Amino acid sequence: MTVTMKVMKKNNRKSWSLYIAMALLIPCLSYSKQLYATVYSGVPVWEEAAPVLFCASDANLTSTEQHNIWASQACVPTDPNPHEFPLGNVTDNFDIWKNYMVDQMHEDIISLWEQSLKPCEKMTFLCVQMNCVDLQTNKTGLLNETINEMRNCSFNVTTVLTDKKEQKQALFYVSDLSKVNDSNAVNGTTYMLTNCNSTIIKQACPKVSFEPIPIHYCAPTGYAIFKCNDTDFNGTGLCHNISVVTCTHGIKPTVSTQLILNGTLSREKIRIMGKNITESAKNIIVTLNTPINMTCIREGIAEVQDIYTGPMRWRSMTLKRSNNTSPRSRVAYCTYNKTVWENALQQTAIRYLNLVNQTENVTIIFSRTSGGDAEVSHLHFNCHGEFFYCNTSGMFNYTFINCTKSGCQEIKGSNETNKNGTIPCKLRQLVRSWMKGESRIYAPPIPGNLTCHSNITGMILQLDQPWNSTGENTLRPVGGDMKDIWRTKLYNYKVVQIKPFSVAPTKMSRPIINIHTPHREKRAVGLGMLFLGVLSAAGSTMGAAATALTVRTHSVLKGIVQQQDNLLRAIQAQQHLLRLSVWGIRQLRARLQALETLIQNQQRLNLWGCKGKLICYTSVKWNTSWSGRYNDDSIWDNLTWQQWDQHINNVSSIIYDEIQAAQDQQEKNVKALLELDEWASLWNWFDITKWLWYIKIAIIIVGALIGIRVIMIILNLVKNIRQGYQPLSLQIPVPHRQEAETPGRTGEEGGEGDRPKWTALPPGFLQQLYTDLRTIILWTYHLLSNLISGIRRLIDYLGLGLWILGQKTIEACRLCGAVMQYWLQELKNSATNLLDTIAVSVANWTDGIILGLQRIGQGFLHIPRRIRQGAERILV
């Protein structure tokens, strides 16, 4: 029993040794390296932005055309070598209905119209009663319908002399007149101009030329424009083929209603855009893939008369007839190819059915407008400065029966067999502005023939009722919201801001300066990554984008920088034309915004201690909650920088605050370290070059003490005098000679009697000064000697303490070494015993197996003998 207990005790001791060894090894094996936040500059990361865009155009500086004048003052010249960089493997969301570029273009075109068609006079409306009769004409046909809508009105106006009136005549459209309920009127022919009391009229004179030229919208420095190149893209949703440009393509700011003129064509299929194309009262924007030529003509000439109304005047068409004058100067017409137009409507219907996923046969009707203001119920556009109003009833008079996704079985339209279609138009002076909703009177039509060639590139439609998948559906032309036209031109653009940096976790950290251990670590190289430019590696993973800067990088960066530099040089070259107008201020804001963004980003990097570094390691420990479901390997191998930046967008401000706090602490540590470094220059105090400075300080101290002593003496004298004492005069010491011996003296003093002696210095100022100096010198000497003695004793104590500390440290190290040696020996013994036990067990098992095999073998070997013995027994 005693032997068994000893064996168990020995086994328990070995087990405890094994447990301790495992406890020491498990933390080492389970250790995972800490991740730290690292700032990367120049990574392909962006976010949507709304900066102030500026325009570029190829304006003719010598032209007097109003659009050229406006473009030369508001826009910079275009870049002769524009660059477009495709982004591989990059997808991004676009939304034309929330694109601020549309709003900015809308404001710009308003500014263009305000400047190009700027009125020269401002006057109140002709609020007078007029007697109007139908305009007599012998013409018949389509154009006569427009003439029949006009009235010949006569009215009285006030001349410069207020007490004198004069009768005038002018032509007005019926839609611009309101009948007056006057009992004295004959046959109810008294009229007045509509809204004459509520509208301020701006009259444009003289007539100006107005021909739109293409305008390019450009992003300022630090921003870029994404362009979607998907063929089936409709302005909303995810785009898979994206490229980066600095400026858009040339956009012609043509203003029109119902039809889109001179716009951007769809590349393959007809493009249909809308917030909800199956609802009624929602605009459906159609962009054709083939242009349809339309030519508008106004024939004839006319004279213009001035009608004075007091100190002002109003210009109108005269009724004087001559060989070359005609009241038909306000009548025009437009021609187009009916076959091409009919095919465009049919393809629009088929494309619409594909978008709404229609499976059954339906009937689609294109009908005339439902009415409204003349600008909405007609095709309204500007041609050579004249305002055209065209009736499009003939263009939208088609019915497509039994239509499917592939085609329509029957088409019902106009019965005319003529290949070219014609729509009547009229020119008007009284125009309701699409910009501010106010009415304006412009000068009468200019004389001569007017011809405008335009391309129909789209149309704006509305459903009468919500989409009916089993019955008829009617589409009508609408207009009025010019933003729909700008959307067809800007649907595939969006502006983004290039982020200067991003944050990601790495295993490298910034060396922390500790005031107790001021040793600086050498920064590790890490990934050694330099990026291929701002957006050239946008589609690559974070790890793949981290490659060395190559020649391709220089070319990409050089291209982007050169393009921005070209634009800025163009702005600088045109500064004399960019006046301090709205556009001049906008150009200045665009440049200042880019500069402010750059300064703000550089300031943030400076505060983080990352100035001039592409990769900036920090001492901020990465929180695993920031990464979410991603680990370190999946971040660098599976995500792009854009995806990663969107993932940490909600916590980026927290990370930035942590980096800022860590940098502040780092600066405090540096300050404390520098203060500690000052003690290292203690031995410089004994430098011979500083002795003169020490002597000067000593002289100043002694002089100050003497001065204080003199002041105290003077104050003491003043005090004594006030108390009634008289100060003694200064006495000069004189030698004292021995007096002659008097009779009766025995000369008991002895010695040399004839030697002179000095008596003690009588009390006075010099004696007091000498005493003070002697006292100060002795005090200084004793003070310095005591200080040196104290320092020596302190050094002795420090040395003794350091020696004792060293002895203790050595003893502790020896003890630790002995303990470690003991535990290592125990581990070695435990391992040896374990191996011995395993060997003995294996040997026992091996011996048992061998013995069993031997017995089995012997059994097989004894089989013949047993058979022989059995046979012998049987035979016996």
Curated annotation (Swiss-Prot):
GO terms for cellular component: host cell endosome membrane; host cell plasma membrane; membrane; viral envelope; virion membrane. Residues 524-544 are annotated as: Fusion peptide. Residues 369-379 are annotated as: CD4-binding loop. CDD domains: HIV-1-like_HR1-HR2 (cd09909). Residues 468-478, 470-478 are annotated as: V5. The keyword Signal applies. Residues 646-680 form a coiled coil. Residues 1-33 form the signal peptide. One of its GO terms (molecular function) is structural molecule activity. The record marks 523-524 as: Cleavage. The chain crosses the membrane at residues 698-718. Residues 675-696 are annotated as: MPER. The keyword Magnesium does not apply. Pfam families: GP120, GP41. Residues 153-196 are annotated as: V2. Disulfide bonds join 55-75, 120-205, 127-196, 132-153, 218-247, 228-239, 296-334, 383-452, 390-425, 610-616. Glycans are attached at residues 60, 89, 138, 144, 152, 156, 181, 187, 197, 229, 234, 241, 262, 276, 293, 323, 337, 357, 361, 391, 397, 402, 415, 420, 449, 455, 468, 623, 638, 650. Keywords: AIDS, Apoptosis, Clathrin-mediated endocytosis of virus by host, Cleavage on pair of basic residues, Coiled coil, Disulfide bond, Fusion of virus membrane with host endosomal membrane, Fusion of virus membrane with host membrane, Glycoprotein, Host cell membrane, Host endosome, Host membrane, Host-virus interaction, Lipoprotein, Membrane, Palmitate, Signal, Transmembrane, Transmembrane helix, Viral attachment to host cell, Viral envelope protein, Viral immunoevasion, Viral penetration into host cytoplasm, Virion, Virus endocytosis by host, Virus entry into host cell. Residues 390-425 are annotated as: V4. One of its GO terms (biological process) is positive regulation of receptor clustering. HAMAP family: HIV_ENV (MF_04083). Some of the most genetically diverse regions of the viral genome are present in Env. They are called variable regions 1 through 5 (V1 through V5). Coreceptor usage of gp120 is determined mainly by the primary structure of the third variable region (V3) in the outer domain of gp120. The sequence of V3 determines which coreceptor, CCR5 and/or CXCR4 (corresponding to R5/macrophage, X4/T cell and R5X4/T cell and macrophage tropism), is used to trigger the fusion potential of the Env complex, and hence which cells the virus can infect. Binding to CCR5 involves a region adjacent in addition to V3. This is Envelope glycoprotein gp160. The lineage of its organism: Viruses, Riboviria, Pararnavirae, Artverviricota, Revtraviricetes. The gene is env.
